[in-house]
């Protein structure tokens, strides 16, 4: 059993075209599934959950800003990924932890822990989830790109983003209707519990998709990468600096909004 699991996470240089197509399709399905979990633990859903356990506007705003803070870990995660033979194992493991933390948030109101403890638990779970998400972001993107030919990359990413957006919109409407139905019946805690149970099934599909995706062998840099190089190398590239400034401004505007 252990050998079979190890084989699943191994890189391979003998991947057929059919396996490449299947892996790309599974990445799209993974995006459609995972976005449901992210949707019900962010935005209006997160505000409603925090308010339900007794968090005020200020605390809710602080919790909502935690993902931006956690993104700083990407500097260190790039070093970890660059010095590893493959991205799949650590990506799947951290993705599972991320999803489980987000799912547990939905059941916090059921535990009736009191306002302070409940808010603290949600903040810790939310931080851990987005720490894991930020950590694997670089590796997951590289893993995805390794499965797509350069001339098809733009079209594939456009299709993936479109499908994810449709799934996110549809899922948000359905899940919000479910939550509203229970809220109007003064059973909002039960509503979050039902959504949590549905998301457990979605999580199983999500992680199964990630596990089944193949990972091709990638050529690594001969010289090991360290933290200093990871910071210096991008900053010496003018194009990267322009993109960095753009995303900094985008992040500030997005968080204000």
Model-found features: residue ranges?
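A membrane-interface helix-boundary motif in multi-pass transporters
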Residues: 87-89, 118, 177-201
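Cytoplasmic helix-loop-helix junction between adjacent transmembrane helices
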Residues: 129-162
